[in-house]
Design a protein with these regions (language model features):
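Asp-based, Mg2+/Mn2+-dependent phosphohydrolase catalytic module
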Residues: 2-35, 41-46, 51-71, 75-233
């Protein structure tokens, strides 16, 4: 397959790793692509800057030679936040580990009542499995925009399913709120990865983001069936 394409846009979580360890077969495939002078871009819906994801991959013992091109939804959102596109003051809905996405504007962080918009990077606690708390939390704030830095609904950390920011975003929309998404499957982030005319293929495990995103850009895709949808097959 690889001889037909110039550029490979590859998802990370569910393809390269499972949140706990690397997929050795996937690393071998990436190594072969690079040896054949193919352009490899890791495109992730991680709600953190690309540099933070690189650190995480280093902790999983992924070699730096593979990590030259990483783009995250958090990185794209961070650029927009610094331009104050949605107002100045924000409320952060998500775990503390995602604070790096707003590090440069951290002085503008405030509470729900005073904020101009809601910055959603996920649930407060990875282990939560009930979204009713968030429905109560947000019910009086649907007049504000919610910025979703990870459109994924769920992810598997090892064998454990966890909610992502996308699940809160969908809940917020169902309550009548407006959501602005950064990341896959939306076209803007793909335009940062390749130019028109490049023979490009996307590889991912999420039908709603990876494969839909490829379809939105009219590029080919490879679906990894033993990732986030594995229980459905």
């Amino acid at each position: 397959i690889y001889t037909s394409y110039d550029t490979f846009i590859i998802d990370l979580w569910g393809v390269i790793h499972n949140g706990i360890k690397l997929n050795s077969k996937a690393i071998e495939a990436v190594d072969n692509l690079m040896k054949n002078k193919k352009k490899v871009i890791f495109l992730s819906n991680a709600p953190r800057p690309s540099s933070e994801v690189k650190k995480f991959l280093n902790e999983l013992k992924m070699d730096n030679q593979y990590l030259k091109n990483i783009l995250t939804s958090g990185e794209a959102a961070m650029q927009a936040l610094q331009e104050k596109k949605y107002g100045k003051f924000f409320f952060h809905l998500g775990p503390k580990r995602d604070d790096s996405v707003f590090f440069k504007i951290k002085e503008n962080k405030t509470n729900l009542e005073k904020c101009n918009f809601i910055l959603c990077t996920g649930l407060f606690d990875d282990g939560e499995d009930d979204l009713n708390y968030y429905k109560e939390l947000l019910k009086n704030h649907t007049d504000k925009k919610l910025i979703c830095t990870n459109p994924d609904l769920t992810v598997h950390r090892g064998d454990v399913k966890e909610y992502c920011a996308g699940s809160i975003a969908k809940l917020f929309e169902s309550m009548g709120g407006e959501v602005i998404y950064f990341g896959k499957p939306y076209k803007e982030i793909y335009k940062m990865c390749f130019r028109s005319g490049e023979k490009t293929i996307a590889i991912g495990d999420n039908l709603n983001t990876d494969i839909r995103g490829a379809n939105n850009m009219y590029i080919d895709s490879i679906f990894i069936s033993n990732g986030v949808h594995r229980a459905e097959f």
